[in-house]
């Protein structure tokens, strides 16, 4: 709640010393500037679903809409005056943030037989590729979707880091971001394997039972792996955006 309460526009968000650092950081992204490409992507997904009859196309469009919500909430928090309102929006933002990096796991839907090796009569081998255009279209939609969604997630994490208390040392700021990445890893596990949604937090008893019942070495390692991957993507994003 304390972090969300400080989430405001860049200028009043930090004192002059921190503002100097932010000039080297990531420039704010307006939803209006990115809604066009995302709408084109969603339309392509829906078109794929209609042409092929594959409901995965509609699912990708829906997932992209969910991935955009954290950025929308981030901008809403900057305009929200009451601290209680910013705190509530911040909590919803945290619950929805895993939806961004979740789309990376949609890559499991890549068609299995895109490339194979075939033995020829003369004893040599040849590499064959799928001649089905729908499979290549799906591969493109999955890759572009994962890329767009990961960028949205990294921008949301950048907004979080930029509005942490300016007095915090760099290790503390990175630890806070890493903690959020860990929560994202947990959210991705809940969504991909247990099929929970962000709003299932309204049923905490059922959620807790499912989580405890599925606890294993695999789930712990998966969450840790996703958290490290998200944190690595974010650090690369920050480095490239300077």
Describe every region a protein language model picked out.
Residues 142-165, 225-242:
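Transmembrane alpha-helical segments in integral membrane proteins
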Residues 47-58, 77-81:
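Short, hydrophobic transmembrane alpha-helix segments
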């Amino acid at each position: 709640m304390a972090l969300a309460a400080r989430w405001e526009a860049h200028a009043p968000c930090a004192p002059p010393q921190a503002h100097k650092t932010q000039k080297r950081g990531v420039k704010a992204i307006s939803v209006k500037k990115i809604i066009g490409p995302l709408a084109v992507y969603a339309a392509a997904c829906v078109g794929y679903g209609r042409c092929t009859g594959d409901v995965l196309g509609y699912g990708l469009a829906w997932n992209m809409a969910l991935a955009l919500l954290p950025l929308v909430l981030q901008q809403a928090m900057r305009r929200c005056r009451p601290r209680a309102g910013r705190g509530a929006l911040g909590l919803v933002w945290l619950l929805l943030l895993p939806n961004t990096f979740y789309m990376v796991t949609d890559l499991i839907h890549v068609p299995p037989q895109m490339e194979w090796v075939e033995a020829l009569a003369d004893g040599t081998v040849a590499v064959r590729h799928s001649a089905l255009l729908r499979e290549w279209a799906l591969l493109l939609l999955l890759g572009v979707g994962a890329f767009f969604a990961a960028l949205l997630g990294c921008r949301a994490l950048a907004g979080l880091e930029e509005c942490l208390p300016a007095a915090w040392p760099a290790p503390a700021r990175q630890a806070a971001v890493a903690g959020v990445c860990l929560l994202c890893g947990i959210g991705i596990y809940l969504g991909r394997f247990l099929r929970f949604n962000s709003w299932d937090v309204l049923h905490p008893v059922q959620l807790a039972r499912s989580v405890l019942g599925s606890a294993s070495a695999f789930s712990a390692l998966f969450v840790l792996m996703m958290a490290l991957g998200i944190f690595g993507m974010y650090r690369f994003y920050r480095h490239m955006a300077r």
